[in-house]
Amino acid sequence: MFRKKKKKRPEISAPQNFQHRVHTSFDPKEGKFVGLPPQWQNILDTLRRPKPVVDPSRITRVQLQPMKTVVRGSAMPVDGYISGLLNDIQKLSVISSNTLRGRSPTSRRRAQSLGLLGDEHWATDPDMYLQSPQSERTDPHGLYLSCNGGTPAGHKQMPWPEPQSPRVLPNGLAAKAQSLGPAEFQGASQRCLQLGACLQSSPPGASPPTGTNRHGMKAAKHGSEEARPQSCLVGSATGRPGGEGSPSPKTRESSLKRRLFRSMFLSTAATAPPSSSKPGPPPQSKPNSSFRPPQKDNPPSLVAKAQSLPSDQPVGTFSPLTTSDTSSPQKSLRTAPATGQLPGRSSPAGSPRTWHAQISTSNLYLPQDPTVAKGALAGEDTGVVTHEQFKAALRMVVDQGDPRLLLDSYVKIGEGSTGIVCLAREKHSGRQVAVKMMDLRKQQRRELLFNEVVIMRDYQHFNVVEMYKSYLVGEELWVLMEFLQGGALTDIVSQVRLNEEQIATVCEAVLQALAYLHAQGVIHRDIKSDSILLTLDGRVKLSDFGFCAQISKDVPKRKSLVGTPYWMAPEVISRSLYATEVDIWSLGIMVIEMVDGEPPYFSDSPVQAMKRLRDSPPPKLKNSHKVSPVLRDFLERMLVRDPQERATAQELLDHPFLLQTGLPECLVPLIQLYRKQTSTC
């Protein structure tokens, strides 16, 4: 009678106008998903591909963040943050932790820890000794050399120990400053004296005043028995013998404060005058022997020579001149003369060629002195460039405006080592464009971002992806490029085997692009199937210029470790001087990829693959019996260990194998087959 009335359940209708457009399933035989939307499929494919690497010694240094209280394990801070931190230091190894270092370990030490380099290269390759900053160099037995002229200090010691000889620093700095030749360094003697006096007069635990001049002195190693000059950066301390007891807490705290100050405020380096002496190998000292360098000629200038090029960047870009990319004037390029710009083409307004002597970015150096003799080594960076300074420099080369007002319908279609790629539509024309978005704060080497803009803007070719515009949007660099709907060559070679006509067609297009770029002095340094894009009608274009470098008559060689491990040339891995020949080797690896479906040693770890590429004979095809003799000969011309014997792009264009080149339409069935496999069950 008084029963509660049941609520009437709402009726839910079936979907109206429903269309089942996407059907995704899992193929157990292939072990992968099929029918995924393109943007999902591209993300999965990208995650499985090896990422490019850059020289760890060239990683962009960033501004120090405010200190935070850190508690490791059960150790509690005692007498404030500094004392607690010093208490934790006793539990850490200097080798295993970089937390308290002003700089990262040398690239050689990191490479040895990965098994990347053998000890034999230290004595045989003197140029490798010049790849790291002066304050980080070690003797052949791995002992850090302190700045008092070479006294070894063991790894178990604290870096940058307490000064013990107060009078050495001013005298050494004064003598060094007085020897400076270029006009812009007159007065450096007084600055160095002020800096030395400031560092010495500070009581234990007190930081030097921030008004001190922030330029230090560094010099490169010269001659097999020449001195390692003193450095304003790290003082003139003499290292304690490894067997001595630990310093007192007060001494440790004072030393740490000094190190923190130097890492924050004294990370800049001045330069020394040029010298005609030739760099030699490091001294062969014993682990416990003292190093007493004789006083000889002045070290070579660390200022960049007149009109010389950055170590890893195109001509005129805002990038460092580093000792790892020093040139050898005796070795000339075998390609066409490489100049800073296209013949007959004037530098565009606002281009890096116009501004390169005025703007500084990450790891930039002092303006180049036209009076410095050719052949002088490039120097250390003048200091940490702030994020705002870098943005201001980048703003000089990009287009003005906000692309968000011009674009809509963003869809993420890929992700790379420097950023993400989205597909967008232009509002005014309806044209689809690819937008590469790169966060400036998340770059290993942010100065390489200039390559994305400058090279693609200044060097246009039928077989190079066209760049429309570039913008600075907040903290990101946006590069608008043409969208190639055929996708990357990787998608095809991992699914389908190409015949020789199709391989020849791809190689001919890539070689046309490389011949053009090499004639302009541009090294791509990341040739692989991921960098080759296709249109729906079968045209082939080269993309991904984020790791390229520019060479010229002044700097005809490079030396940085840049590229993707499985495609790297042996001379890149061994840190030898190299030029455009490295792209030819990488193209040869890509040919193996098109025949076998993957590059050589792909089942090995990247480090192991790099070892084998460096030390073993050139890799061979797994399915060599399936290819013609002319293709094998074409491949052997590219995979030659000696760069001087390796064929150039122009020579390969005349090879008989490329007579099999077909029309772009011969690649269309491959594109259609891949699209069909990824869109249906």
Curated annotation (Swiss-Prot):
This is Serine/threonine-protein kinase PAK 6. Gene3D superfamilies: CRIB domain (3.90.810.10), Phosphorylase Kinase, domain 1 (3.30.200.20), Transferase(Phosphotransferase) domain 1 (1.10.510.10). ATP binds at residues 413-421, 436. The lineage of its organism: Eukaryota, Metazoa, Chordata, Craniata, Vertebrata. GO terms for biological process: apoptotic process; cellular response to starvation; cytoskeleton organization; intracellular signal transduction; learning; locomotory behavior; memory; neuron projection arborization. It comes from Homo sapiens. It holds the Pfam family PBD. Its EC number is 2.7.11.1. GO terms for molecular function: ATP binding; cadherin binding; protein serine kinase activity; protein serine/threonine kinase activity. It is found in: Cytoplasm; Nucleus. Residues 12-25 form the CRIB domain. Residues 407-658 form the Protein kinase domain. CDD domains: CRIB_PAK_like, STKc_PAK6. GO terms for cellular component: cell junction; cytoplasm; cytosol; fibrillar center; nucleoplasm; postsynaptic density. Residues 308-333 have a biased composition (Polar residues).
